[in-house]
Amino acid sequence: MSNVSEERRKRQQNIKEGLQFIQSPLSYPGTQEQYAVYLRALVRNLFNEGNDVYREHDWNNSISQYTEALNIADYAKSEEILIPKEIIEKLYINRIACYSNMGFHDKVLEDCNIVLSLNASNCKALYRKSKALSDLGRYKKAYDAVAKCSLAVPQDEHVIKLTQELAQKLGFKIRKAYVRAELSLKSVPGDGATKALNHSVEDIEPDLLTPRQEAVPVVSLPAPSFSHEVGSELASVPVMPLTSILPLQVEESALPSAVLANGGKMPFTMPEAFLDDGDMVLGDELDDLLDSAPETNETVMPSALVRGPLQTASVSPSMPFSASLLGTLPIGARYAPPPSFSEFYPPLTSSLEDFCSSLNSFSMSESKRDLSTSTSREGTPLNNSNSSLLLMNGPGSLFASENFLGISSQPRNDFGNFFGSAVTKPSSSVTPRHPLEGTHELRQACQICFVKSGPKLMDFTYHANIDHKCKKDILIGRIKNVEDKSWKKIRPRPTKTNYEGPYYICKDVAAEEECRYSGHCTFAYCQEEIDVWTLERKGAFSREAFFGGNGKINLTVFKLLQEHLGEFIFLCEKCFDHKPRMISKRNKDNSTACSHPVTKHEFEDNKCLVHILRETTVKYSKIRSFHGQCQLDLCRHEVRYGCLREDECFYAHSLVELKVWIMQNETGISHDAIAQESKRYWQNLEANVPGAQVLGNQIMPGFLNMKIKFVCAQCLRNGQVIEPDKNRKYCSAKARHSWTKDRRAMRVMSIERKKWMNIRPLPTKKQMPLQFDLCNHIASGKKCQYVGNCSFAHSPEEREVWTYMKENGIQDMEQFYELWLKSQKNEKSEDIASQSNKENGKQIHMPTDYAEVTVDFHCWMCGKNCNSEKQWQGHISSEKHKEKVFHTEDDQYCWQHRFPTGYFSICDRYMNGTCPEGNSCKFAHGNAELHEWEERRDALKMKLNKARKDHLIGPNDNDFGKYSFLFKDLN
């Protein structure tokens, strides 16, 4: 069943209808005052819908709701209708919260300035502004803003924390705040002061309530007929006090009187304390509420409730059709009157006649069953059959009528909510089979019903009505509401590449050509494939579940390490979070402290789980603890330019972290257990290579017929081939270079060529090619001219090694070497023992053999470790590092136009068709290019801010070549 409550569903419908009306040129049929009520109610509904979406952590949709409400407020102003300034202020505050959660600091500052222009002492705006300025590195301005906020709410923990952080960064002395003594008075439930203390500057503004003065009489129209018998018979229903129907959620709103069918009224009697906030009934408030409720007796409606044919008559004059009544829900649901036309018109005659005629067949046995449930705000069924207080819904807005505005639709009868047996409705709530059900059609097919229909790659036809026994072994799909109605095959997601970025369409397919790697291409062939692959990678879509299996993704640590390689270990979190990042393990001499040579933190109290992947570079991925607020999805900011919220972000910051969260959510495994499993995985790998239990696939028979060895990479650059010393701690040259993974190179010699060749690590490209080819420059006997890491093999030996590693899922050169050693074990057991065991035989152990391997600084952008301040400064000032700050592999796919020149305006000569400079022109050639330049500038600014925050850029370094234009706007 759907989790959306009936109240919220009605509100969404009212929003949709309200937007349709104000976008039309039709004049409003009521007075100006009634039109003002209508627009304010629409703004209120958009605000409350935005709040509900915010609680679901859908920031984008929430922003859309708040922005729509603000736009309508501007529209109302043009109609000489005033939306209260307090509501405008709250809309901006809540939109600011969304922007802050998404890391859009420029948007946060823009909205904060608007709010502060309306109310200079708004604490939430001051706090959000300070936080955004802090994230952008403008600490002095941030401190000035939070100082004003601190004076207003000195006890708010978030304000205190931010104030202290900024004071530390600015070098200010942190003063302990004075706390006044408070009188020990018993607080009254619902007391405003108590309530204020429970709200934080981090919270959004609560839902808007309906003000009492907006219960305006409706437009006078010909009234439909009600039966005398309906009035007289329903009058016999006994009425119970409102407090007997619990639990209730009642808003402080224009509470309508309980209008009975005979026109009488029963006022809503409710303690004022409980009219404050229907969502917060906790502790003592709940106890007081329960104590005030009388015992409920099940009241059975008399069997003679409705009998015989109903004669129509005019409505009793004592039964007012107010805006509050016509929009009223069952009393079990918390509700604000919707901005629907049903508030201003009486029910349509045709709908009431349908209702009255349907009552002929209404029996007592059915009434008790069908009057059983309504839906609360949270979607929980509330039993209302014990209550005899019946409030009637209007038959819906005029947009649902076939006679209004020329819109043809089936007439609705909302009385079916109460008299379910009178109007039979088939249940349309079906549990979605997959998360794309709202936008995509996915089906199972086979080679018989999904057949090739043309010469092109995507030429397939689906025969849905063919009579056959479908194997259902092919997933096909298409996007709804698009012109292209053809079904596309959705291939299995490529899993051999450890790729975290967005998927892209194959260039050959996009150019309407045949794919060179047809069927094996790791690029997508259609948008449907991209959408399914993206969800599959996140773990949100399971083909097994869609094809009828149990749908569980049984992740284990072994499976994660097979897919992502590397290992899980514990590092010191304080060192890891330091700016710039430092890498410290547990100290071998003192197990209670970290291995940092200067600041030794308590390791157990500050340890964090980290996934380490050593390839051509070293990549550390922090695995944060999983909790209820974590979202099982990748953070789009982290993928693009680095998330400024860091550990406060609820989204996963790497694919391996996402997989760990999914595993923890399913199994509850702890970080300690993950680290132990990782250690056991590598122990098994060393003890039983090529064990199928560990690698998941048997090593290809007939290992490469080559000799393999490691040499010192630093010496190799100077033309020297130097192997390690017998302890494998340093190279055997006089320089004594450290023998670590990132400082050694592999060389192989084939039996045929009898020549040692250098082997580079396997390319870490997003899309691994089907086969590796020789570099054209090398094949022609020239030197490779490619700037960077050429992904083509530079020798036949390198091509063989890469192909073997790709086909066997081996990413690490060290792992490849270990496998080769194992394959040679039977022939050269003595040599292997001396090479694989680092401390075999009687050796003299020097103190330096056990020296702690520490990394003073680590650049996560380049994957480079630096062991001194001088080396670090040299690295962050290098051109290669600066290019890494701004450049990503996805840039060639994301952008279509030239790189921004720094002049963000359109070329007048180009618009006149006379620009002679072409691509050399410093101005934008068209709106599309200008828009992309502005978007690209914003993305580059975010990357720059992230790099500055992590101290990956020198504080006074403004020399960034073509990127220097970014510094004009930052200071």
Curated annotation (Swiss-Prot):
GO molecular function: miRNA binding; RNA binding; zinc ion binding
Its biological purpose: May be a specific regulator of miRNA biogenesis. Binds to microRNAs MIR7-1, MIR16-2 and MIR29A hairpins recognizing the 3'-ATA(A/T)-5' motif in the apical loop.
Localisation: Nucleus
Source taxonomy: Eukaryota, Metazoa, Chordata, Craniata, Vertebrata
Xref: InterPro entries: TPR-like_helical_dom_sf, ZC3H7A/B, Znf_C2H2_sf, Znf_CCCH, Znf_CCCH_sf
Presence of the UniProt keyword Lipid biosynthesis in the record: no
Zinc finger (C2H2-type): 857-881
C3H1-type ZnF: 634-656, 769-797, 906-928
Gene Ontology cellular-component terms listed: nucleus
Top-level lineage group: Eukaryota
Protein name: Zinc finger CCCH domain-containing protein 7A
Gene Ontology BP, a term: miRNA processing
UniProt keyword terms in alphabetical order: Coiled coil, Metal-binding, Nucleus, Phosphoprotein, Repeat, RNA-binding, TPR repeat, Zinc, Zinc-finger
Modified residues (Phosphothreonine): T210
TPR repeats by residue range: 43-76, 89-122, 124-156
Gene for this chain: ZC3H7A
Pfam families, sorted: zf-CCCH (PF00642)
Disulfide bonds: none
Coiled-coil features, chain-numbered ranges: 924-952
Isomerase as UniProt keyword: no
Main location group: nucleus
UniProt source species: Homo sapiens
